[in-house]
Amino acid sequence: MGVYTFVCRSSGDEWTAKQLKGELEASAATPYELQRRLVAAASAADSAAGVQSSFSMVSPSSAVFQVIIGAVGGGAAIGGGAAAGAASGGAAAEAPKAEEKKEEEKEESEDDLGFSLFD
């Protein structure tokens, strides 16, 4: 599995990207085209199956783009334990707790406050 992180910058009409730790580079007219070229470059450097990517704008003229080659499963790989918890069913276990909390909040009424808001 290979992880390729790129720093992307816009200078006028062109977006450029340089790999954070490596020599891969690309440029394009739009961020979308730049992402496509970076995925192609990373895929050429690493022949494993499965590609995930994440593009995050840092400012209007800069972004961070990450390509993960050889990733297993779906969903975002960024987020560390959150993605692993969701893949293992951790999110499903948390859902009933959230529903219980909502039910508890609904049990409170105006009578508990000692006055009515609409009198």
Curated annotation (Swiss-Prot):
Transmembrane segments: none annotated. Pfam families: Ribosomal_60s. Residues 81-119 are annotated as: Disordered. Keywords: Phosphoprotein, Ribonucleoprotein, Ribosomal protein. Residues 84-95 have a biased composition (Low complexity). GO terms for molecular function: structural constituent of ribosome. PANTHER family: 60S ACIDIC RIBOSOMAL PROTEIN P3-1-RELATED, LARGE RIBOSOMAL SUBUNIT PROTEIN P3Y-RELATED. Plays an important role in the elongation step of protein synthesis. This is Large ribosomal subunit protein P3. It comes from Oryza sativa subsp. japonica.
